[in-house]
Amino acid sequence: MGLIDIIVAVLLDFAIGDPYWFPHPVIYIGKLISYLEEVGRKHFKSNKGLKTLGGLVVLTIAITSFGIPFLILWMVKDSFWIFHFLNIILIWTTLAAKSLKVEGKRVYYALKNEDIQEAREKLSYIVGRDTRNLTEEEIIRADIETIMENTADGVIAPLFYAMIGGAPFAMMYKGINTMDSMLGYMNDKYIHLGFFPAKVDDVFNFIPARISGVLICLSAPIVKGNIIRSFKVMLRDRKNHKSPNCAYPEGAGAGVMGIQLGGTNVYFGKAVYKPTIGDRIKDLHHELINDSVKLMYASETLMVIIYALTVTSYNLR
């Protein structure tokens, strides 16, 4: 039934995504992280103390985000339908494909309507960089980078952990990833507090990021890309990012679409140089945002198909 639960959760995300009316667990995880930071900063003042606080936050969030779903499912383990209903709902809340598509395509529609100011504003909701003065090409690049990176973080990774350990594992991953997105910055405020959150997130994304890269490469035909070229670009440029993981999905996407990603961006008023990823075979055009969304969905579908075939073949032994 684990396979059925995952398929239903994926279909739910396809259909309705993250409705605003639903009490999303990530909201409460985020509130807990903010509370731990606020209280912790009152007691941990030194750089070493802040690093220790970061480690304590990691433990608290990992235990809480795993423990609560585990206890909920354990309490209803004798009720078949309630158990699987809750497992499906919890897994569904960890998946972000539909919301990523919606947010990414808001930028696309603004560019299609030649409203660059609107595109900058919509982009600012989903990226950490300063979007106020971005050109159209820079907006497109940022949107594609976000979709490719979050194909790994927001789609493939939670699926991977759900396949290993159901909703508790998927939710624990989501807690760790949320913690990294809130604390894992290398600026003056978070360089010490965010050290362990960032490192732990890197560890948890190590395998999913590489799986994502492979799946994106294999999905190349869906956008008339070349599988072999995609793998070559991904493997060549896999280290062209400060993160040990991000260049895999971004490199795969760049290889599939024949574009160049990376380069200098402005974060919190500071210019941050990043090596380029991919080859500029094509100029960046807003229609490529649609291609990146197609690659995200194709990768997710391929992941589920491979898992289904694996489970089925194992059960037939």
UniProtKB/Swiss-Prot annotation:
Pathway: Cofactor biosynthesis; adenosylcobalamin biosynthesis. Pfam families: CobD_Cbib (PF03186). GO terms for molecular function: ABC-type vitamin B12 transporter activity; threonine-phosphate decarboxylase activity. It is a multi-pass membrane protein. GO terms for biological process: cobalamin biosynthetic process. GO terms for cellular component: plasma membrane. Keywords: Cell membrane, Cobalamin biosynthesis, Membrane, Transmembrane, Transmembrane helix. The chain crosses the membrane at residues 20-40, 56-76, 80-100, 152-172, 203-223, 292-312. It comes from the Bacteria. InterPro entries: Cobalamin_biosynth_CobD/CbiB. It is found in: Cell membrane. Converts cobyric acid to cobinamide by the addition of aminopropanol on the F carboxylic group. Belongs to the CobD/CbiB family. This is Cobalamin biosynthesis protein CobD. The lineage of its organism: Bacteria, Bacillati, Bacillota, Clostridia, Eubacteriales. The gene is cobD.
